[in-house]
């Protein structure tokens, strides 16, 4: 199922405006495909309606985008320049592009992965 659901709103006043949007599903199958001393390869399932994906890493007390995949067919990414024997946290979400606007789905559960010694 590509979408969780549809929603709409009508704003009435001096003029009436309508708004319609779809809520994307979260990304499924998010996991570590492989680990090395200085890198982690992450993978996920292709979203049926996704235009791309946003991958974030938790660094310095905040979430930082490390990858924005602009192709819906991209289902893996290797995060490099990591420290050996260290745990890292990641999360991902899909987005759908409508014209110049990106509509984001919900974030995945946080994935914690440790690099090798």
Description of each model-found segment:
Residues 15-21:
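Structural motif
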Residues 22-49, 84, 101-117:
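Pro/Thr/Ser/Gly-rich low-complexity, intrinsically disordered linker/stalk tracts
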Residues 79-99:
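Beta-strand-rich modules
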Residues 1-10:
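Structural signature of eukaryotic scaffold interfaces centered on beta-propeller domains
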Residues 32, 77-80:
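Hydrophobic core positions of the immunoglobulin-like beta-sandwich fold
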Residues 47-69, 74:
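Extracellular low-complexity, O-glycosylation-prone stalks/linkers
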Residues 27, 44, 55, 79, ...:
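An aromatic-rich alpha-helical recognition segment common to small helix-rich domains
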Residues 21-23, 57-59, 94-98:
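Residue-level signal for short segments within beta-strands and strand-turn junctions
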